[in-house]
Amino acid sequence: MSHNDTIVAQATPPGRGGVGILRISGLKARDVAQEVLGKLPKPRYADYLPFKDVDGSALDQGIALWFPGPNSFTGEDVLELQGHGGPVILDLLLKRILTLPGVRIARPGEFSERAFLNDKLDLAQAEAIADLIDASSEQAARSALNSLQGAFSARVNHLVEALTHLRIYVEAAIDFPDEEIDFLSDGKIEAQLNGVIADLDAVRTEARQGSLLREGMKVVIAGRPNAGKSSLLNALAGREAAIVTDIAGTTRDVLREHIHIDGMPLHIIDTAGLRDASDEVERIGIERAWQEIEQADRVLFMVDGTTTDAVDPADIWPDFIARLPKNLPITVVRNKADITGETLGISEVNGHSLVRLSARTGEGIDVLRNHLKQSMGFDTNMEGGFLARRRHLQALAEAAEHLEQGKAQLLGAWAGELLAEELRLAQQSLSEITGEFTSDDLLGRIFSSFCIGK
């Protein structure tokens, strides 16, 4: 498929609605207007017109908007037809447009891809369009809009410019070694490098917040049967999401709930009670429980406080702890404090967090909520943030690593050439975020996740 083709797609969600929009972009958009509308509308003015079939009969009537390139979303000629939102009507109009030579259905995200290729958006802004559509909270939506308006890109571009300036100094020190001022040893380059590292650390902190807003945190509730796992799921979700009985093994499959804690998405997973099961269905449920545990960001180790006084997970169930993935964070949740009379709250035991609560009464649930938020480093007071994806975090981490290696070369051996190379690599990593240096394969993966009409 060529970027010279003219593309068309429905820009509104499928199904019935008051308004349905078809978007056309490319060189043939002008021909589509002449054929379907009988005229070329005045640029950027709403024109109420009939939408005509091949024989001249009306298929629908509605608003036509004409945006000649380069002053359009894609940078190409763009025509938008806003008609009635019935699927049959839109399908008839789409088929009519596709009868014209050189016009084809758009690939997912192709409109945004063309906007990127025509320098109307950088890659981070293009990704923000999809993130804005998929936002699951008000805070995520606001942060996605900030990214779309260039907040994230501006921070990255500032770092790139600072690195460019620093590289000039380093290259000058390499190319003109006989000058009176030795830029490598007089401390100026070190001071500038430290400034860039500090700025990058600040951006990484904000990016981690943005990633939490977008990705959320996956928390798996695990433990023995009848420890109160399903009751905890219901308490966190604020509704009866799981069946709760006194019968051991009631939960046999994985149950998922998605909630928000001050804007941070939390993916809670209730699992089957872990034990040696003879029942085939329960055994499969336990296998799935372990699969979820291995992919978790944190495990809530649920303990029935009426069965043991132990608080160290290694003492409570050593075989369970031994099987957990290395470095997986664990929070021990001692349940049924309403029965045992334990003091509600949170403490630390041998490097693990310990929360005492009652899932049945809801006492102590707020303590657990705050603990989950703090354990991920989520800051609800951070204003003007932006959303970030995992690839952004990886690129920022790579840039930080190159800068630290460059600093080591500078202070350890005054190796200007090696410092210059590390600065170049750091700059390249940052430029991957905005798409200045990005492989075609990565671009294809990013835009293929978009809506068809975007």
UniProtKB/Swiss-Prot annotation:
Asked if the Swiss-Prot or TrEMBL record annotates the protein with the keyword Cytoplasm, the reply is yes
Main localisation: cytoplasm
Q: Mention one GO molecular function.
A: metal ion binding
Q: What GO terms in the biological process aspect are recorded for it?
A: tRNA methylation; tRNA wobble uridine modification
Q: Which residues does the record give as (6S)-5-formyl-5,6,7,8-tetrahydrofolate binding sites?
A: 23, 80, 120, 454
* Binding site residues for K(+): 226, 245, 247, 250
Record: residues binding Mg(2+): 230, 251
Cofactor note, please?
Answer: Binds 1 potassium ion per subunit.
**EC id:** 3.6.-.-
Q: Which UniProt keywords apply?
A: Cytoplasm, GTP-binding, Hydrolase, Magnesium, Metal-binding, Nucleotide-binding, Potassium, tRNA processing
Q: What class of enzyme is it?
A: hydrolase
Q: Which residues bind GTP?
A: 226-231, 245-251, 270-273, 335-338, 358-360
Superkingdom of the source? Bacteria
Show where the TrmE-type G domain sits. 216-377
A GO cellular component annotation in the UniProt record: cytoplasm
Could you tell me where this protein is found in the cell? Cytoplasm
Q: Per its Swiss-Prot or TrEMBL entry, what cofactor is needed? A: K(+)
NCBIfam families linked: mnmE_trmE_thdF (TIGR00450), PRK05291.1-3 (NF003661), small_GTP (TIGR00231)
Function of the protein: Exhibits a very high intrinsic GTPase hydrolysis rate. Involved in the addition of a carboxymethylaminomethyl (cmnm) group at the wobble position (U34) of certain tRNAs, forming tRNA-cmnm(5)s(2)U34.
Q: Which family does it belong to?
A: Belongs to the TRAFAC class TrmE-Era-EngA-EngB-Septin-like GTPase superfamily. TrmE GTPase family.
Which PANTHER family is this protein grouped with? TRNA MODIFICATION GTPASE GTPBP3, TRNA MODIFICATION GTPASE GTPBP3, MITOCHONDRIAL
Q: What is this protein called?
A: tRNA modification GTPase MnmE
Lineage, broadest ranks: Bacteria, Pseudomonadati, Pseudomonadota, Gammaproteobacteria, Enterobacterales
